[in-house]
Regions:
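Active-site helical microenvironments for divalent-metal-assisted chemistry
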Residues: 1-150
Length: 150
C-alpha cells in the first residue's frame, strides 16, 4: 500500500477526489494476498513513472508482478477490449479477479458521477461518463462470460 500511496501522491480522479481512493478500494475487494496487493498497485504503472522493474526492486512478489504486467494497459499499442481479452486469455486468476474488482468499482463510482452530472446538467460530462460506463459494462460482461478457472 505504501508504494501505491507514493505513486499516486497528489493525483486526482475525474471528480477531483484523491486518485489513491480507487486502488485502495480495489485492493480491499481482493480475496487473496496477491489480489489485495495487485489491487492496490493495479494503476501504478499506468498512472505514474514507476515501472514493473521498479516494483520488483521494491520487493513486490513475482505473482503480483505477473498480474500487474497484464493489468497495465498500454493504450498506444493495444485497444481497450483487446487488453481485456488478453487478461482473460492469460488465465491469470489474480489479474482476472483484480480486473473484475476494478470494473465493479469503476462502475459504482461512475454511476455516482453520472448522477451528479445529470443533477448539474453538465452535458459534456454526461456524455463522457455514459461512454466510459458503457465501456466498463461491456468489459465486465466479457469477463463474466469467459471460460476461466474461477
Amino acid at each position: 500500500m505504501k508504494i501505491a500511496l507514493e505513486a499516486h501522491a497528489g493525483q486526482k480522479d475525474l471528480d477531483g477526489n484523491p486518485a489513491i481512493l480507487h486502488p485502495l478500494a480495489v485492493g480491499l475487494m481482493g480475496n487473496s494476498d496477491a489480489e489485495i496487493k495487485a489491487g492496490f498497485l493495479h494503476d501504478v504503472v499506468e498512472d505514474s513513472s514507476m515501472t514493473l522493474e521498479d516494483l520488483k526492486n521494491k520487493g513486490v512478489e513475482d505473482e503480483v508482478i505477473a498480474a500487474l504486467a497484464l493489468l497495465s494497459h498500454d493504450k498506444e499499442k493495444v485497444g481497450y477490449f483487446e487488453y481485456v481479452e488478453n487478461i482473460i486469455a492469460s488465465g491469470n486468476v489474480t489479474a482476472i479477479h483484480v480486473k473484475l474488482n476494478d470494473l465493479h468499482h469503476n462502475l459504482q463510482r461512475g454511476k455516482v458521477s453520472y448522477e451528479a452530472a445529470v443533477a448539474s446538467n453538465d452535458e459534456a460530462k454526461i456524455k463522457e461518463l455514459g461512454r466510459i460506463n458503457a465501456k466498463h459494462e461491456k468489459a465486465l460482461e466479457m469477463i463474466k462470460n469467459a471460460d476461466y478457472e474461477k
